[in-house]
Amino acid sequence: MELHILFFILAGLLIAVLIGFSLWSARREKSRIFSNTFSTRPPSTPINNVVSDVPPSLNPQSYSQTMGQNSEIEVDNPVQIQQEVESSLREIKINLPGQDSAAYQNRPQETPIYSGQPVQPVQTQYQAQAQYQSQPQHIEPAFTQAPQSPIAEATSVLEQSVEELERQAAQGDVDIYSDASVRVELAKNSMQADSVAEQKPVAENNMLTLYVVAPEGQQFRGDYVVQSLEALGFQYGEYQIFHRHQHMGNSASPVIFSVANMMQPGIFDLTKIEHFSTVGLVLFMHLPSEGNDVVNLKLLLKTTENLAQALGGFVLNEHREIFDENSRQAYLARVS
């Protein structure tokens, strides 16, 4: 029993020694790691000795000192500034339009700006040009003689010939009633005047025109128009319109007549033909045509009537009137 008590006492002492040793070791390690090192650092640099990265030129104090020195210099030398300004003004030269350099040099110099007297403003070249353009300009209209028509020219030639012959007859050089050459010359001049007078109406009526229009409030569908034209022998070609050739199916043969859209710009865009619609078509034939004009005109009239019947429209003449029998006879009379 005494041994057991002694053993417990020794074990307790051993445990107490181990705990004390561990606490002492931990305190020693902590003091070694977290030791106070502030005493070993050098003393801090005073604030007044801090080095600045700002250059001296940007220092407000130095700038104010520099400005003060410059102001003192400017105040101390007003006469020198006056002389420099006057010399700069003398070197300025402004040349106006219409003035040469010699005339400008002879002019007296302008009074300097700083002399205390008002100076007249100098008018530059652009100001002078703007003032000239702003003034109202009165332009007299130029009347040019209009070119005379062929009939008037032929009449004037005939009158001049008659006047010349009358003058010669008055002088006794020629007899205008008995001389055969004079009668031949007068006849030639008269024939020339008549031929020129007959050429003008022919030139004006060199094309026959017919219209196929839809009923009021309706329009022709684009795909149906193309289908009807191709069924009548038309071929899509030059100028984006349809043409009727002399030989059906042969686009290399001459064109007899053509058909275009009645609405501007008058073409058929096949890429958008599904969304295309128009109120009318115009058929036209140039005179003279390839082959017989009468035969071609009859073919044009027949084709126009068939197209109007296929589309459900009406045929109009060149005056936008209903095409009737009188219009047919008038068209045939123009080519007969």
UniProtKB/Swiss-Prot annotation:
One of its GO terms (biological process) is division septum assembly. Pfam families: ZipA_C (PF04354). Interacts with FtsZ via their C-terminal domains. The chain crosses the membrane at residues 3-23. Keywords: Cell cycle, Cell division, Cell inner membrane, Cell membrane, Membrane, Transmembrane, Transmembrane helix. It comes from Actinobacillus pleuropneumoniae serotype 5b (strain L20). It is found in: Cell inner membrane. GO terms for cellular component: cell division site; plasma membrane. It comes from the Bacteria. The lineage of its organism: Bacteria, Pseudomonadati, Pseudomonadota, Gammaproteobacteria, Pasteurellales. It is a single-pass type I membrane protein. Belongs to the ZipA family. Gene3D superfamilies: ZipA, C-terminal FtsZ-binding domain. The keyword Electron transport does not apply. Essential cell division protein that stabilizes the FtsZ protofilaments by cross-linking them and that serves as a cytoplasmic membrane anchor for the Z ring. Also required for the recruitment to the septal ring of downstream cell division proteins. This is Cell division protein ZipA. Its main location: membrane. Residues 24-336 are cytoplasmic. Residues 1-2 are periplasmic. InterPro entries: Cell_div_ZipA, ZipA_FtsZ-bd_C, ZipA_FtsZ-bd_C_sf.
